[in-house]
Design a protein with these regions (language model features):
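Glycine-centered loop-to-beta-strand initiation motif
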Residues: 436-450, 529-538, 545
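Enriched for extracellular/lumenal, surface-exposed ectodomains of secreted and cell-surface proteins
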Residues: 454-476, 547-563
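Beta-strand-rich domain onsets/edges
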Residues: 380-413, 479-501, 506-507
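Glycan-recognition patch characteristic of GH18 chitinases/ENGases
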Residues: 26-131
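Glycan-binding loop/region signatures in secreted carbohydrate-active enzymes
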Residues: 257-346, 378-381
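Substrate-binding surface in catalytic domains of secreted glycosidases
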Residues: 69-83, 149-294
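Conserved, mostly hydrophobic/aromatic
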Residues: 59, 143, 171, 214, ...
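Short flexible loop/turn segments that cap and initiate beta-strands
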Residues: 411-436, 508-523
Length: 572
C-alpha cells in the first residue's frame, strides 16, 4: 500500500491585486458605481454597464417581485424578451460583475407585514428567496420592500419592526451560509435632531451587522408638487445618519437618473383628448439624457440650483384639437432633473464619508458627462494597489500531507505592506463558491506563510482584505493536486481455490473515483468508489505460491492518478 513518489516543484506567481483601468493603468478608479438594471431596454442599458466595468463591482437586475410566502414573480420572463435571461446572466458574470438581483414587495397593503409576523411564513419567504439565489447562482439578493412606507402606514411600524429584524437575521444567515450577500434598499432615515420625517421601520442600527449593503433611495423628495427630486442637504443628512448606524463601507447612496415635469397651471379649455391628462398636478417622468432636448425644443433655459444640486426650467405647451385648431389649452410646466453636476455633487459624498459607493436608478438614464464625472471622482479617491507573489513548495501532495504557501505583498514602489489581512481560499469540485481555509496577517516585511493540508484536488488563491486605502486583491488561481491513499483488507495468506472478499478504502472519502485492481500484474477488474470512498472485489488463487495485488487509480476532477505499492500474500 502506498502512493507514487512526488517531485518537489517550487513555483512563483506574480500578480497585481487590482483590476487596472485600460485607460490609465497608473490610476485605476475606485469601484464605487453600482445600481439597478431594469428588464426593459437592455440594448441601451447594458452598454452603460459593460462600458464602465472598471467602476463597477456589482449591479442589481430589477427582475423579481415577491407575491407570497412561496412565490416570486419573474418580471423578465413576463416581459417575453427575445434574449433568454440565462444569456444576460452569463454575459454579466463573464465580465466579473457580482449580481444581486432586486426583489420587490408586490403584495397588497399589510400582506407582507402579516407574513413576517408568522414564524412559519417568515421562514418560507427566506427559503423561497434562497432557492432563487441558488437556482441561478446569483451572488446574493437585494431587498426593495417599499410597501411598509408607501401603503401600510406608520401606525403598523411598531408591531412590524421586531418581525422585520427577525426576517433579516434569518435571511442573512441563510444567504451567508451559502457564501451569498444580502443588500437592503430603503428610503432615507434621519437623526432625530434634523426634525426630518424618517423611515425608522427599516431599523438601520439593528440590521447593520446582518447585511452587506444598505442602499439609500435618496430621491422622490418631490412628488405631488414641483421641486428637487433629491435635494442635496436632505440626501447628505440621510448619509450622515446611516454611517452612525453601521460601517460607512456598507452604505451606498442611491442617485436618481430621472426627473419630473409637473403641470402647474392650465389656461383655456383643453380638447377632450387632453382633459384627463392636462390638469394641474399631473406629472411626467423625464430622464437625464433627454432633459436638455426637452428644454431646447420648448425654448427653455435650464438653471442649476447649487443648493439642491439639480437643474430646473419652466416652459409652456399648447394642446390643440387636431380637428379644430380653435380648440386648445396652454399648460405651464416646471421641470426638475439631475445632470452631470448633480451626479458629481452626490458622488463626492462617497469620498467625504468613505461610503461603499453610489447606486444609480437606473443604468441607461444618465448622459455621458455624468459617467465621466463619476469616473473622475473615482480616480481622485482611488485606493493603493498591492502587488503580491505567491509561492508553494509543492504542486502535488499525498493525501494528508502538508505543503507550505508563502505570500509577499508590496506596493508598486516595492514598499512592503505590513499588518495586511489576507485570506487563503480554496475551491474544489464540490464547491459552488470560494471558501476560506485559513487567514492571517502579513509581517513587517509584508510576508505571510501558511502550512496547508488539502483533502482533495483544489484551486487555491490569496485574497487581501479591502479597505478605504487599499483594494481587495485576488490572485490568479492555482491548482494543487492530491494523490489518494489506498488501503486493502488483504489477509497475510489465503487458501488456494478459495474465494475471498477484499475491501478497499480510498482517501479522500469521495464517490466516483475510478480504479483498477491488478493481480499478479494483470487486471482483475475495474471498480468505482462509493460515497464513503470504499470498494470491494473477489479474489481466488488458482495455484499455491505468492500472489501480488496492486491498485491503479485513474485521474479525475477530484484527484490525480496514483499507483499503490504491490502487496504480496502467501497462497497455501
Amino acid at each position: 500500500m502506498g502512493s507514487r513518489k512526488l517531485l518537489i516543484i517550487t513555483t512563483a506567481l506574480t500578480f497585481l491585486l487590482s483590476t487596472l483601468s485600460p485607460a490609465n493603468a497608473n490610476n485605476p478608479p475606485r469601484k464605487i458605481l453600482s445600481g439597478w438594471l431594469p428588464d426593459y431596454s437592455l440594448a441601451r442599458n447594458l452598454p452603460t454597464v459593460e462600458g464602465n466595468l472598471d467602476l463597477i463591482r456589482d449591479i442589481s437586475p430589477f427582475w423579481y417581485g415577491l407575491t407570497g410566502e412561496n412565490s416570486i414573480k419573474d418580471k423578465y420572463a413576463l416581459g417575453k424578451y427575445t434574449t433568454p435571461k440565462e444569456q444576460v446572466i452569463a454575459r454579466l458574470k463573464a465580465n466579473g460583475i457580482l449580481l444581486l438581483p432586486t426583489i420587490t414587495d408586490d403584495n397588497n397593503k399589510l400582506v407582507l407585514a402579516n407574513l413576517l409576523a408568522n414564524p412559519t411564513s417568515r421562514s418560507n419567504i427566506v427559503q423561497t428567496i434562497k432557492a432563487l439565489v441558488l437556482k441561478y447562482n446569483y451572488d446574493g439578493i437585494d431587498l426593495d420592500f417599499e410597501t411598509f412606507y408607501t401603503q401600510d402606514g406608520r401606525s403598523s411600524w411598531a408591531a412590524l419592526k421586531p418581525n422585520w429584524i427577525a426576517f433579516i437575521k434569518e435571511l442573512s444567515t441563510a444567504l451567508h451560509d451559502q457564501g451569498k450577500l444580502l443588500s437592503v434598499t430603503t428610503p432615507p432615515d434621519f437623526a432625530p435632531e434634523t426634525k426630518r420625517a424618517g423611515n425608522w421601520i427599516y431599523s438601520w442600527a439593528e440590521i447593520g451587522p446582518l447585511i452587506d449593503r444598505l442602499r439609500i433611495m435618496a430621491y422622490d423628495f418631490s412628488t405631488t408638487s414641483p421641486g428637487p427630486i433629491g435635494p442635496l442637504p436632505w440626501t447628505e443628512d440621510g448619509v450622515k445618519y446611516a454611517i452612525t448606524q453601521m460601517p460607512a463601507s456598507k452604505v451606498f447612496l442611491g442617485i436618481p437618473g430621472y426627473g419630473r415635469d409637473w403641470i402647474t397651471k392650465v389656461e383655456g379649455v383643453c380638447p377632450k383628448d387632453f382633459t384627463s391628462s392636462v390638469v394641474v398636478g399631473a406629472k411626467a417622468a423625464v430622464v437625464m439624457r433627454e432633459a436638455p432636448n426637452l428644454a431646447a425644443s420648448n425654448n427653455a433655459l435650464p438653471t442649476y440650483n447649487t443648493t439642491n444640486a439639480e437643474s430646473t426650467f419652466t416652459y409652456k405647451k399648447t394642446y390643440v384639437d387636431p380637428t379644430n385648431s380653435a380648440s386648445f389649452c396652454t399648460a405651464s410646466r416646471t421641470v426638475w432633473y439631475p445632470d452631470e453636476r448633480s451626479y458629481a455633487a452626490r458622488t463626492n459624498l462617497v469620498g467625504k464619508y468613505r461610503l461603499g459607493g453610489i447606486a444609480v436608478w437606473t443604468f441607461g438614464m444618465e448622459n455621458t458627462a455624468a459617467i465621466t464625472a463619476v469616473r473622475d471622482i473615482a480616480k481622485s479617491i482611488a485606493p493603493d494597489q498591492v502587488i503580491g507573489t505567491l509561492s508553494t513548495d509543492l504542486e502535488e501532495i499525498g493525501y494528508g500531507s502538508t505543503f507550505n504557501l508563502t505570500g509577499t505583498f508590496k506596493l508598486p514602489d516595492k514598499t512592503p505592506v505590513p499588518a495586511l489581512n489576507v485570506r487563503f481560499e480554496i475551491k474544489n469540485s464540490s464547491d459552488n463558491n470560494w471558501r476560506t481555509l485559513s487567514a492571517g496577517v502579513t509581517d513587517l516585511a509584508g510576508v505571510i506563510a501558511f502550512p496547508i493540508i488539502l483533502g482533495q484536488k483544489s484551486q487555491i488563491r490569496l485574497v487581501s482584505e479591502g479597505s478605504w486605502e487599499r483594494t481587495e486583491g485576488k490572485t490568479i488561481e492555482k491548482v494543487i493536486s492530491v494523490v489518494p491513499n489506498v488501503s486493502l483488507s488483504l489477509p497475510a495468506s489465503i487458501k488456494v481455490a478459495t474465494s475471498y472478499t477484499v475491501y478497499g478504502q480510498v482517501l479522500p472519502k469521495v464517490a466516483g473515483i475510478k480504479l483498477v485492481v491488478k493481480q499478479n500484474k494483470k487486471p482483475l477488474g475495474e471498480f468505482t468508489t462509493d460515497a464513503s470512498g470504499g470498494f470491494s472485489f473477489e479474489i481466488k488463487a488458482a495455484t499455491t505460491g505468492l500472489a501480488t495485488y496492486q491498485v491503479v487509480i485513474s485521474a479525475g476532477e477530484k484527484n490525480t492518478a496514483a499507483i499503490s505499492d504491490e502487496i504480496t500474500i502467501l497462497v497455501r
